[in-house]
Amino acid sequence: MIKLLKPMSLSILLVFILSFSFPFPTAKAAANDNNVEWNGLFHDQGPLFDNAPEPTSTQSVTLKLRTFKGDITSANIKYWDTADNAFHWVPMVWDSNDPTGTFDYWKGTIPASPSIKYYRFQINDGTSTAWYNGNGPSSTEPNADDFYIIPNFKTPDWLKNGVMYQIFPDRFYNGDSSNDVQTGSYTYNGTPTEKKAWGSSVYADPGYDNSLVFFGGDLAGIDQKLGYIKKTLGANILYLNPIFKAPTNHKYDTQDYMAVDPAFGDNSTLQTLINDIHSTANGPKGYLILDGVFNHTGDSHPWFDKYNNFSSQGAYESQSSPWYNYYTFYTWPDSYASFLGFNSLPKLNYGNSGSAVRGVIYNNSNSVAKTYLNPPYSVDGWRLDAAQYVDANGNNGSDVTNHQIWSEFRNAVKGVNSNAAIIGEYWGNANPWTAQGNQWDAATNFDGFTQPVSEWITGKDYQNNSASISTTQFDSWLRGTRANYPTNVQQSMMNFLSNHDITRFATRSGGDLWKTYLALIFQMTYVGTPTIYYGDEYGMQGGADPDNRRSFDWSQATPSNSAVALTQKLITIRNQYPALRTGSFMTLITDDTNKIYSYGRFDNVNRIAVVLNNDSVSHTVNVPVWQLSMPNGSTVTDKITGHSYTVQNGMVTVAVDGHYGAVLAQ
């Protein structure tokens, strides 16, 4: 196309004449060829494009849109303001070129106010118009997936910038054999406990129950292995499955929220562990997230007391119990609301605002949530189990009351520590709990990470059923699920390959360690908080529950294990480059034939091109790094191999092994 300058007004021309001795940036506006080049369009809320990704109510937000140099004649920001439930327009002005002279940047400012806003861009070239929002460019105006502006909503920086390590305590390390549950130590619902040797099968022997099989892992064991987690691997956030007193090995059937289970130690053991996690003597400063099982208790909790274990009368024993209204009975005593129909998990009744249950769980100064956030514990956040189901009167959640509860919970938690993390367990689109900035900071990213990664790399879904997607479908899935969330939520999502509820990634990949390598490279370079389920870093296998909770093989926990070594290197790389944590994300290649996926992570300091090869054979890939404004003649270095490459004609050519990747940084 022929490129012409925009006609200048007389006032601008006079300024130009009077300022001839100074450089004057001139917009390279397009001739009217009526064609917006989509391949040049880009915006997200990374540092290059948004000056205030977490604005206060008094901060205006200046946004930038990238286009090809000289390609468009005008651009506008169109935003919906919830203050007046109306659309508003902001004309954009040309701002600058990129360092390579390939792109223009246009900017516009949305004025400060406390209201939530949603914005998209209208881009014009003569009579041609394109639109751009969280789902990318389109020829027609979108009606969903706009970018978010949520004043005064901040997610913890340590969560965005950290790497998480999830531990199922009974199976990690036995640091104190004196507290081990032995075979026959107690019975629960008529079944005795069973003690197993470390490394043996997780399945119960005849006469026992899988949930009552114990291996001896405890908090002292976690404390003794902090050097492995924080130094060897480099992870700095620990998330523990439930640790409070409960009869089973998984502890999702709480008997006492205020006491650490004796099999794991005691409350002083927890204090010591937290102090050591926070310490920098054994690695980077760490953070601890506890599992809050607040939808239900166990049936052995004294509030319920189904087995008459306590002198006080629980709700199951008496309708005059002080805790009777903590639960919902349909026909007392045997018909009551429970979690997914499991009678061993009676569902808490949160009632109306100000209810006793709301008080004891989060509102009171001595509530469960506040007690552990305050000294002497000072935990750093809560992961909320079965969070969608929390409700009143036996209702099953995902309703107005559920959202009210989590809004109150947020106020209570942030009132103690504004930097505490709140992560809800949800298996689908958690937008209803995150898009208003008043409930969760983030969610478990089954839908936006675990499932698409599994289907693309292993050809199985996270429950090990056959399910395969192409590279293009993978990219589309990722883009669509990112668009569900505000950017600071995207950056805080819990991104895991496996967890305690699904089959192990290594089992889904048929034990092919190269597929674990590929998944790790993606996990550590994608948007969100990488979350390693203990053992995934060395390729631990395991089927459905309880097989996904095997005891940790400490002979593998060394850099001599190639997957552990790669995990260590990738975490080091992620920690080195903020662009991998809070930078922009741009798709570069989706090659379905060769199964190549490439994307850029970049900010105002670094530009990184990640290349993933999901094929079983090596491929030579031409990476269009011109999209990242990498200049010709400049050098990029693969941070995994150390090999360097020169940018030629806007491209970098790199050979990538099958089921492996490259992280090309400059």
From Swiss-Prot:
The record marks D501 as: Transition state stabilizer. It catalyses: Hydrolysis of pullulan to panose (6-alpha-D-glucosylmaltose). Ca(2+) 3 binds at D305, N309, F310, S312, E317. Its main location: secreted. Pfam families: Alpha-amylase, Alpha-amylase_N. Ca(2+) 2 binds at N174, D176, N179, D180, G216, D218. Residues 1-29 form the signal peptide. GO terms for molecular function: metal ion binding; neopullulanase activity. CDD domains: AmyAc_CMD (cd11338), E_set_CDase_PDE_N (cd02857). Its cofactor is Ca(2+). It comes from the Bacteria. GO terms for cellular component: extracellular region. It is an enzyme of class 3 (hydrolase). InterPro entries: Glyco_hydro_13_cat_dom, Glyco_hydro_13_lg-like_dom, Glyco_hydro_b, Glycoside_hydrolase_SF, Ig-like_fold, Ig_E-set. The keyword Methyltransferase does not apply. Keywords: Calcium, Carbohydrate metabolism, Chloride, Glycosidase, Hydrolase, Metal-binding, Secreted, Signal. GO terms for biological process: carbohydrate metabolic process. Binds 3 Ca(2+) ions per subunit. The active site is at D385 (nucleophile), E425 (proton donor). The keyword Secreted applies. It is found in: Secreted. PANTHER family: ALPHA-AMYLASE FAMILY MEMBER, MALTODEXTRIN GLUCOSIDASE. This is Neopullulanase 1. It comes from Thermoactinomyces vulgaris.
